[in-house]
């Protein structure tokens, strides 16, 4: 139907401090992953924490990681909203989100 997007599963919204995993390895040192840290959207709080978005950074043992996928139809401060399961630049995924706020 014109004007409708294909069905996208609803996923919990990601926020600063939510975690991601990172499968990369530098030499013999695994990157592991860590929390989403900046910049986020400080004017949009989800479960009391700033919303995470496409382009936001995440802590990693190796070089800094960043969010490279988000909800194409939900923009927060001009960027796609990040969700549980969205990808990072190191081929990892966001593993935590606010389960009371679902974004499709």
Predicted segments with their positions:
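Intrinsically disordered, low-complexity proline/glycine-rich segments
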Residues: 1-104
């Amino acid at each position: 139907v014109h004007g409708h997007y294909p069905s996208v599963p609803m996923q919990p919204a990601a926020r600063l401090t939510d975690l991601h995993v990172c499968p990369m390895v530098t030499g013999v040192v695994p990157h592991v992953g860590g929390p989403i840290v900046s910049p986020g959207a400080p004017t949009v709080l989800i479960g009391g924490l700033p919303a995470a978005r496409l382009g936001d950074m995440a802590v990693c043992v190796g070089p800094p990681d960043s969010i490279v996928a988000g909800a194409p139809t939900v923009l927060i401060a001009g960027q796609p909203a990040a969700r549980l399961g969205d990808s990072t630049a190191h081929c990892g995924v966001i593993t935590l989100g606010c389960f009371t706020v679902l974004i499709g």
